[in-house]
C-alpha cells in the first residue's frame, strides 16, 4: 500500500502544478498520452503479469514528471513478486504432495491394506460356499444354475437339520 501511495501523491502534485500554471496546457496530455511515444516495445521491456504487482502496473518507464525531468524509473519504487499458494496453481505438484505427503501416503497405504484384507476375506468365503455346494446332495441343487450364497446357506441349514433328525431317530431305536 505504501508503494501505491507515493506515485498517487506525485500524480496529484503534477496535476495541480500543470493545471495552476496553464489551464490549457499540453503538458498533462503529453504525460498521459500513450500514443505520443513512438518507441517500440521488446519482450525484455514488457514485464510479465506475474512478475509485477498490480499496484505498479500503471507505472511505466515512459512516464516522467514534467517539472523535475525525472522518470519514475529513477524513483525508489519497489516491485514485489507475487507469491501465490501452490495449491491454487498446482505448478509445483511435488511440493504440494510433500506438504500433505506423509498423511496422504499413510491413508492410501491403509486403504490398500484394508482392500487386500477384504479381498482375502471374500475369497475365503467364496471357497467355503463352493465347498458347501459340492457337499450338498443333488436334490438341493437347482439343476444347472449354481445356488446363490443365501440359497446355499439355507439349503445347508436344512440338510444339517435333516441329518440331525436322522441321528436322533437312530439313537432312539
Swiss-Prot record:
The keyword Transcription regulation applies. GO terms for cellular component: nucleus. Residues 99-114 have a biased composition (Basic residues). Keywords: Developmental protein, Differentiation, DNA-binding, Nucleus, Transcription, Transcription regulation. Residues 109-163 form the bHLH domain. SUPFAM superfamilies: HLH, helix-loop-helix DNA-binding domain. It is found in: Nucleus. Residues 39-68 have a biased composition (Polar residues). The keyword Nucleus applies. InterPro entries: bHLH_dom, HLH_DNA-bd_sf, Mesogenin/MesP. One of its GO terms (molecular function) is DNA-binding transcription factor activity, RNA polymerase II-specific. Residues 39-69, 96-117 are annotated as: Disordered. GO terms for biological process: cell differentiation; mesoderm formation; regulation of transcription by RNA polymerase II. Involved in specifying the paraxial, but not dorsal, mesoderm. May regulate the expression of T-box transcription factors required for mesoderm formation and differentiation, such as brachyury T, wnt8, vegt and eomes. This is Mesogenin-1. The gene is msgn1.
